[in-house]
Amino acid sequence: MSKQAAVIELGYMGISVKDPDAWKSFATDMLGLQVLDEGEKDRFYLRMDYWHHRIVVHHNGQDDLEYLGWRVAGKPEFEALGQKLIDAGYKIRICDKVEAQERMVLGLMKTEDPGGNPTEIFWGPRIDMSNPFHPGRPLHGKFVTGDQGLGHCIVRQTDVAEAHKFYSLLGFRGDVEYRIPLPNGMTAELSFMHCNARDHSIAFGAMPAAKRLNHLMLEYTHMEDLGYTHQQFVKNEIDIALQLGIHANDKALTFYGATPSGWLIEPGWRGATAIDEAEYYVGDIFGHGVEATGYGLDVKLS
């Protein structure tokens, strides 16, 4: 894949929510994100670093993923990737300056992945160097972002092969990394794909799902912040779907907790650097035992 036509990070995402106030409290008190409310009636923003925002919270009541925003390096890469998508038969829409400004980027195109997940490709995000990130609660460190983007997502797909083809076209590498034996004798396969040093930025499998978004992973630089987040979930009796554990692929210490929208957040620490060599696993290193059920991850991992 030419560098002239490749995504380099998950730059931003949009979510829709039914209870904006619950999300403001959750984002700050539970996770340590910064809320930025600029007086817009239909949205507010969540910050993790110097970017104007990393997450847009829309008040339209769907409680699901609205879009994922994938960054390319600049205008030449943007134009080349757009042409790649057209040549491969995908429908894209190049947005005007008004739409681009709404996302606070210099250039924007919109499409959908094969699972119907709204997908945006952009260049030139707004970076507010005069407005340092101010966490919603005290943090020992910060969030891992930079050239690794904001984190990773698992999204719903109905055709894994087509999803792999689409994300490969965007410049991602990766394939099946987990083959998990199920009680019914079948095997669940999960694919993980990366576009930078983060072990993966997107993942998917052939699993039924009520929502587009299964979970979002955010990574702390300090284990103390992960530990405090876990403590906050327990203290506030928020559902924990998977207990603390370490994944076999990204080596991150994480747990999975419920958000006010019913999908999962995966706070983590110490994720490994992505590798290009393919390999797969049949379980995790330890932990990630199922606790609260019904969140789409009722699978024994260790």
Swiss-Prot record:
GO BP field: naphthalene catabolic process
PROSITE patterns linked: EXTRADIOL_DIOXYGENAS, VOC
KW Coiled coil (keyword) present: no
The VOC domain, residue ranges: 9-124, 149-270
UniProt enzyme class: oxidoreductase
Binding site for substrate: H152, D199, H200, H215, Y256
Cofactor(s) it depends on: Fe(2+)
SUPFAM superfamilies registered for this protein in UniProt: Glyoxalase/Bleomycin resistance protein/Dihydroxybiphenyl dioxygenase
Pfam assignment, any one: Glyoxalase
Stored InterPro entries: Glyas_Bleomycin-R_OHBP_Dase, Glyas_Fos-R_dOase_dom, VOC, Xdiol_ring_cleave_dOase_1/2
Coiled coil (UniProt feature): none
Binding site for Fe cation: H152, H215, E266
Superkingdom per UniProt: Bacteria
E.C. number: 1.13.11.56
Protein function: Involved in the naphthalene catabolic pathway. Catalyzes the meta-cleavage of 1,2-dihydroxynaphthalene (1,2-DHN) to yield 2-hydroxychromene-2-carboxylic acid.
Further remark: Encoded on an unnamed 75 kb plasmid.
Membership in a protein family: Belongs to the extradiol ring-cleavage dioxygenase family.
Protein name: 1,2-dihydroxynaphthalene dioxygenase
Lineage: Bacteria, Pseudomonadati, Pseudomonadota
Gene: doxG
